[in-house]
C-alpha cells in the first residue's frame, strides 16, 4: 500500500485490520488517530510521521523506524517492537502496554507523561531521553542504557533494573518503589527528593551523593554505601541493612525510626538531631559522630561504639546500652523515671 492510500484510508476512519504492510515506506505520512489491529508492520519506515493519538493493537512492528515521529498520546497494546527505533520521537502521553521492546532505541526521545506497563525493555537504549512524569510499572529493564537521561517526577514501580546504567543522569523527585536496584551505582548523581521506598538496594553505592529529603522507608540496604553522602532530612524509617556504611555522611535531622542497622558504620557522620527511636544499632560504630540532640529512645545500642562522639543532650531514654562504649555519656539524657512508669502503665479494668 502506498503512503497516500494509507493516509486516505485512515483519514476516512477505516481500521487497518490484519493487513500485511511490512517494509512499507511511510515517512512523513499523516495518520493521526489511525487504528491498526493485528497488522504486519515489521521494518516499516515511519520517520517524521504524524501519528498522534494513533492506536496499534497487537501489531508486529519489529525493526520499525519511528525516528522523529509525532506519537503524542499514541497507544501500543501487546505489540512486538523489538529493535524498533524511536530516537528523537515525540512520545508525550504515549502508552505501551504489554509490549516487547527489547533492543528498542529511545535515545533523545521525549517521554513526558508516557506509560510503560508490563513491558520488556531489556537491552533497550534510553540514552539522553527525557522521562518527565512518566510511569513505568511491572517492567523488565535489564541491561538498559539510560546514560545522560533525565528522570523528573517519574515513577518506577516493581521493575527489574539489573545492569541498567545511568551515568550522568539527572533525577528530580523520581520514585522507585518495590524495585530491584541491587548493586546499582548512583555515583555522581543528584537525587534530591527522590523516593526509594521498599526498594532492594543491596550493595548500592550512594557515596558522596546529594540525598536531600530522599525517602528510603522500608528499603533493604545490606552492604549499601552512603559514606560522605549529603542527606539532611532523609528518611530511613523501617529500613533494614547489615553493615551499611554511613561514615562521614551529613544526615542532619534524618529519621532512622525503627530501622534495623546492626553493624552499621556511622563513624564521623553528622547526625545532629537525628531520630533513632526503636532502631537496632547492635554492634554499630558511631565513633566521632555528631549526635547532639539525637534521639535513641528505646533503641538497641548493645556493644555499639560511640567513643569520641558528641552526645550533648542526646536522648537515651529506655535504650539498651549493654557493653556500649560512650565517652560523652555524661552530657546525654538518660531514662526519665516518670516517663518510664507512664509507658509501663496500663489501664485497670
What kind of feature is each model-predicted range?
Residues 1-349:
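Tandem repeat scaffolds
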